[in-house]
Amino acid sequence: MRRNCNAGFKSPVQSPSSSSSGRGSEYSLQKEVSELQGKEAALDQEIAQLESEGFSMAELEEHITLLHEYNELKDVGQMLLGRLAVLRGVTTKELYAEFGMNLED
């Protein structure tokens, strides 16, 4: 069976003209904006509550920076363990045991 390569292609993505009327899409955009504004207000309230409890945005940003640094270092460690395992012809699981590391780390 041979298919005609020149047959029409029906895209799964609807074109703006084939979607709902302009009013419907405008309504859905307004609804989405309203939902996002509600989420923003809730987040602002949560931030205010955390600040009233003594937390600061600067402290949070510092923690996030440190977590990124930790994750980068952990990734490098994992890469080194993987290379060492290949060189020794063992699994990384065996290296974890050899170095007294927990697999959950």
Swiss-Prot record:
Keywords: Coiled coil, DNA damage, DNA repair, Nucleus. Residues 28-54 form a coiled coil. InterPro entries: DNA-repair_Swi5. Residues 1-31 are annotated as: Disordered. GO terms for biological process: double-strand break repair via homologous recombination. Disulfide bonds: none annotated. GO terms for cellular component: nucleus; Swi5-Sfr1 complex. Residues 11-28 have a biased composition (Low complexity). It is found in: Nucleus. Belongs to the SWI5/SAE3 family. Component of the swi5-sfr1 complex. Component of the swi5-sfr1 complex, a complex required for double-strand break repair via homologous recombination. This is DNA repair protein SWI5 homolog. The gene is swi5.
